[in-house]
């Protein structure tokens, strides 16, 4: 099984702890598990596009799994943007007659971008111009900037409930696997 995680949460979202791990579950079911670990981009990567991430990420990982297990068709699972990349790669593979994939599973993956939903609250021409300017100067959109937008999309869960509990009520939240990594 090849796991293709998101760029932001990385591989560990699928392997948080022994009792909260897709990797451990799959290994326990007898599968050999491979997982892409995306490196953090820098300013030198500013010109990389989706094609590059598909070719140097998804396709390179499929090649590596194929070299390790040449007689086995690959079950691939993509999470979030990793699933979007996997969808594009699988479509191209189908077009090209590349039959290395046994199955494709998508977890929280975006495939239809015609309606941005709540994200459209944060997207307008001036906001896009500001983001493009910041990305051009830094070479990338920084994780903190993306995380802030995601927090605003789920502000009751990710911002206000914690603030109310921690600061106003004086109750400390129990540690959880995700927050240990984040």
Residues of each region from the PLM?
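Extended hydrophobic secondary-structure segments that form protein cores and membrane-embedded regions
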Residues: 2, 76-77, 104-109
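Gly/Ala-rich beta-loop-alpha elbow adjacent to hydrolase catalytic centers
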Residues: 78-82, 86
